[in-house]
């Protein structure tokens, strides 16, 4: 078998954006409002041909990721992953640019999912299948050490990021070249992709084949909410409620006395830029009537 570099160009350059000079076209306002350079607002490369991923391939991609995740022996909070068509649409659009690299966090953000979306990219100049590429990303485990960042293990770290519960992928052909893109929600952050402990240690009530299965729960917890992976329910900040923390529950008065301090009263524009003040003083900060 050829080496990774011989078979597929697989790089993780999250800080580099390659959309400069790419023509743009009108797109759904939900994307352009995130940023005018959003990937969904780009024009496809004239040489790009979409490679349709069959349902069988989608299922295989998800299954492979879940097997990879379930084999992490010391992960206490590893979530089961599922397919997401929204992520897949953006991944496909980036694949149609025929660019070996990443489009940047803001450019592949999904407006319906708060927080960062991660991305793995691969390239091949001969016939490879998507499962082949997923395997190559996973092979980076050979260089992986928990808690130690290694530029050669970025794809694998994204695959095993505990909170990455949704995935969508796209593929294109540009002449003899093949481009593979998978977008993940959420994006890995740092070099500790999961909490160490016994398998399903943090989710005994939702455990499924060594993974925390919240696929029947909300897609995301909005407005600063967090997902309890044991109950698969959102834990919402006090101003918010509902299954995904999008129902505002305004109080009759602000929560803290400090909201009436002269400094806050006289200069709310300044003080309300701080998240704790905005949370404590929803009326003073104009979030509630």
From Swiss-Prot:
Keywords: Cleavage on pair of basic residues, Disulfide bond, Gamma-carboxyglutamic acid, Secreted, Signal. It comes from the Eukaryota. Pfam families: CAP (PF00188). Expressed by the venom duct. It is found in: Secreted. The modification 4-carboxyglutamate is found at residue 33. Residues 1-24 form the signal peptide. Changing residue 19 to A: In form 1, form 2 and Mr30-1. GO terms for cellular component: extracellular region. InterPro entries: CAP_dom, CAP_sf, CRISP-related. Residues 62-184 form the SCP domain. PANTHER family: CYSTEINE-RICH SECRETORY PROTEIN-RELATED. This is Cysteine-rich venom protein Mr30. It comes from Conus marmoreus (Marble cone). The lineage of its organism: Eukaryota, Metazoa, Spiralia, Lophotrochozoa, Mollusca.
